Amino acid sequence: MEQRSSPARSLPPRKTTTTPQLSCELCRKRKVKCDKLTPCTNCAASGTVCVPIYRTRLPRGRHATRPRRVSSPPPTSAPGETDRIIQPSVPVNEDLQERIYRLEALIQGMNSHSHTRTPSATSREQSVQLSDTSTFQTAPNPNTSPILNSSIVSKRLMLQRPDQFWADLVDEIHGLREVVESSLAGGQEGPIPSSDSAKSEPPNDDGIQVLGLGASNPSAALRSMSPLHNPVVARQLCEVYLQQVDPVIKILHRPSLNRWMVQGEPYLSYADGHPAVEALGSAVCYSAISSMTDNQCSVMFHANKADLLAEARVACETAIGRAGLLTTRDITVLQAFVLYLVARRSEDRTPAVWTLIALAVRIGKGLGLYLDPETETFFDQQIRRRLWFTICLMDLQASFGQASEPLISVDESASTALPQHINDSDFDPTTAAHSDPNREGLTDTTFALVTYHAQRTGRLLNFVQHDRKVDGGIPTPTSSTSGTSTSRSRTCDPSWPQQQARHFEQEALRLLHFCDPGTSAYAWFTWHGTQSLIATVRLAAARPLQWHGQAPPPRREGNTELLRLCLPVLEKAQLMHTDPRAEGFRWYVTIPWYALAMALAECYVSSDTALVRYAWPLVESSYLQYEATLGQSLGGPFGQLMRRMKEKLAAPAALPPSSLPSTNWSPATPPTFPGVPRPQSSHDDRHAPGCSWPVPTGSTPPADLGVPSLLPVSTWEALSPPSLDNPSLFGVPPTTTAVADGMDPGADIMWEELFSGIPFNEIAGPDTFFFDMNWGS
């Protein structure tokens, strides 16, 4: 009788003493044929280090003997239990076992939710949910089985969305098939990597290079990442990010980021060197450099900003590609990609960012960011909402820049509640629920929440035909009947845009309650930035990009309302570009081209000599600042309009030269409106630390601001100059018109001709319904 091999003996006896050479590490990973040279041809062509493998080939197919159990099998799991722990006496493939159990847990979890739950089963499920850990929670307990952790994560992903079960099932089956095929392929495959190594090494070729991301030579890209991997450099860039980027783009948790990049602790529950964490760190460094000025880069790193940006961009793209962006199910990878888009948009004027924002929208929808799952921690909820509304904000900004409809509809942008008005220090990954949902006063999320409100109002005012389902939260006479009647009420009700603007003002001023602009640079920026947003919303309500009806209403002779609405927008933008307290946030601010184009057209057709004389220095300075931002002289319709305006001013019958002073703009003397109170000009807070914003409680705004602590729409009236007050701002236009002498009889036609001849996709690039990413520092 043939003697059977023992269980501990899984390899056939060697016939020779020579250890064969198998495929190298890289060829094995790529699953390509290796010529087994030293180095092999594939590694030499790619410029990587060839690591040959010398070992005995493993048996395959029917020649492979299965290990036998010595101990008794484990007891059968109890009903309703979705995880089993098998402890064989001989080593087995842990990754294969983990994937099988995770697949079983996924299917059993789906079956348990398809039947009626008993009270005992519900209590057991709640006990599992309380121990649920996610990507953004603390590190797992080392005594806990990795199989149990993975099954809970799979169960949580399945519960997040009804249709997510099939996506999870396909992913698990695909991963299981890869493990089985890799163990049986070609004979050159070695031991299957463990689950930890599998998580830390996702496929690095998911087609990301077709989008223009990543480097053609990964080894060269990794070498270029070395300066950013310097702990000292990473710590400095993280501090810059927390001071200049995080207050505006609020998608990360400040304490967690600080503990990771500054103090050297692990990031949430990720393992060291995880590709998602590497991608996030590279994106933080890239966005921090993009927010710095040339002087900051020279002082801090003794290098040119352009060189640092190029290096950081390649490193960020390579890290995002290694993290598997196109196939990711990890919210951290999406956070890194959003930060990458924010940074790239500040330096790249091509439509590439507009195209890539669509990818962020798709990934965000695929992860269900716009949904409110029942089973998620407070930490996950806040991070998810912040990321979704930031993507909505960027989607609207991109639609303005490329004359396109937003990808996210109004109902999707309002499908989930806004993040809480709290500080990041108020919660952490272990917070089960937040007892105090909102704070009064300035918080880490104040300015971000204002922009979240503004992006939704911007969709309603400028792209009202894009969505017909949501009536903007303001009841209209016919909004309760159907989507068609809602759209008709928007079109026919002339007061609907003003209602939306009034609603936004109330929400924005509520967030500014107890905000003292003299406490820090962030408080100053939030105060004036919110005023600029309110002024821009007023302008959009009076003159949106897309009219609700068939054609815009005719311009009345002598009506200067639009010009008066444009001036506060331009004034605040110039203030941000000239005041030293806005230096850290200037990368985010740009000259609002829409208000500038409208002001130019209004100045050209207006015959109000006093108003044009007052407005022209501000308009001309804004135009020059816009040209400086673009780095070139404006041509096309916008430049033609400016030339025609200068020709009109140079004409003998135009305004007297003495009445048009030359533009003399300096940071020390920003333009002011008569009667507009302004905060004190002391710069004691310009060097305020940016990592921990002071939150004054129980204080009231200074008396010199002229703004009560919290008032609705009438609050803005205190900020408006008496000479610019207009009773038709939120009501019916005045019945009387001030017909000035010498009014051009064709002013109405000329105004429409000039303004309609300025396509904003030609003159503006991505710009602002509100603040947007600038094209330069």
Swiss-Prot record:
Keyword Transcription: yes
Compartments it resides in: Nucleus
Region (Disordered): 1-20, 61-85, 111-144, 182-213, 419-440, 468-496, 655-699
Ranges of compositional bias, category Pro residues: 668-677
Keywords on record: DNA-binding, Metal-binding, Nucleus, Transcription, Transcription regulation, Zinc
The protein's role, per its UniProt record: Transcription factor that specifically regulates the expression of the ada gene cluster involved in the biosynthesis of the linear tetracyclic TAN-1612 neuropeptide Y receptor antagonist.
A Pfam family annotated for this UniProt entry: Zn_clus
GO BP annotation list: DNA-templated transcription; positive regulation of metabolic process
DNA-binding region: 24-50
Keyword Transcription regulation: yes
Signal sequence segment: none
A single Gene Ontology CC term: nucleus
UniProt organism field: Aspergillus niger (strain ATCC MYA-4892 / CBS 513.88 / FGSC A1513)
Superkingdom to which the source organism belongs: Eukaryota
Entry GO MF terms: DNA binding; DNA-binding transcription factor activity, RNA polymerase II-specific; zinc ion binding
Descriptive protein name: C6 finger domain transcription factor adaR
Biased composition (Low complexity): 475-489
